[in-house]
UniProtKB/Swiss-Prot annotation:
The chain crosses the membrane at residues 11-31, 35-55, 86-106, 120-140, 149-169, 185-205. It comes from Colwellia psychrerythraea (strain 34H / ATCC BAA-681). It catalyses: a ubiquinone + n Na(+)(in) + NADH + H(+) = a ubiquinol + n Na(+)(out) + NAD(+). NQR complex catalyzes the reduction of ubiquinone-1 to ubiquinol by two successive reactions, coupled with the transport of Na(+) ions from the cytoplasm to the periplasm. NqrA to NqrE are probably involved in the second step, the conversion of ubisemiquinone to ubiquinol. The gene is nqrE. This is Na(+)-translocating NADH-quinone reductase subunit E. It holds the Pfam family Rnf-Nqr. GO terms for molecular function: oxidoreductase activity, acting on NAD(P)H, quinone or similar compound as acceptor. The keyword Membrane applies. Belongs to the NqrDE/RnfAE family. Its main location: membrane. It is found in: Cell inner membrane. GO terms for cellular component: Gram-negative-bacterium-type cell wall; plasma membrane. One of its GO terms (biological process) is sodium ion transport.
Length: 207
């Protein structure tokens, strides 16, 4: 249990997708103007990551990993071992795209206001670097199915936390006297950098 809790906390604070690895920054900067919209997109990312990471883990270990199909094909010679890992990227993107399409249809039917607010950025989750990055890290870390579920959900919550914090700060900055040369993306980049420095302080925690 402690092992899974350690993974969960690390993915939220120490290995935050947005503020530690700077993944998914295009959506992070574009949709962080309002807290309500940021929360909606954040929840969508949590759902997609919570499903995409373990789903791709199952597919990778069962089909794509080197030697995964050897027993099924009756191969005993290591020289003839089947390795489909070169199909990982396109397979991962396909799974993510399918999950995003399902989520998009559900939001359109049950939460039309949120669907309209997210606009083009909802289908762009398909190519969100944070989603693909978490799946790639899952393979690199060789996580089990249980670890993948925790890692996916934790990564999503970490990204959601970052975008909601950014949206809250940007809403407050509307009432601030920002220099003309820094208005818009200028002050937003500076704010994101300062937030990243803040999250760096969690790096000293040993889990």
């Amino acid at each position: 249990m402690e092992h899974y809790l350690s993974i969960f906390i690390k993915t939220i604070f120490i290995e935050n997708m947005a503020l530690s690895f700077f993944l998914g920054m295009c959506t992070f900067l574009a949709v962080s103007k309002k807290v309500s919209t940021a929360i909606g997109l954040g929840v969508a990312v949590v759902v997609v990551l919570g499903l995409a990471v373990p789903a791709n883990q199952i597919i990778y270990q069962a089909i794509l990993a080197p030697g995964a199909l050897d027993s099924l094909m009756g191969i005993t010679d290591p020289k003839e071992s089947i390795d489909l890992s070169f199909l990982s990227f396109i397979t991962f993107i396909g799974v993510i795209a399918a999950l995003v399409q399902i989520l998009e249809m559900l939001l359109d039917k049950y939460f039309p206001a949120l669907y309209q607010a997210l606009g083009i950025f909802l289908p762009l989750i398909t190519v969100n670097c944070a989603i693909f990055g978490a799946v790639s890290f899952m393979v690199a870390k060789n996580l089990t199915l249980g670890e993948s579920v925790v890692y996916g959900v934790g990564s999503g919550i970490g990204w959601m936390l970052a975008i909601v914090l950014m949206a809250g700060l940007r809403e407050k900055m509307k009432y601030s006297d920002v220099p003309n040369g820094l208005k818009g993306l200028g002050i937003t980049f500076i704010t994101a950098g300062l937030m990243a420095f803040g999250f760096l302080s969690f790096g000293g925690i040993s889990l």
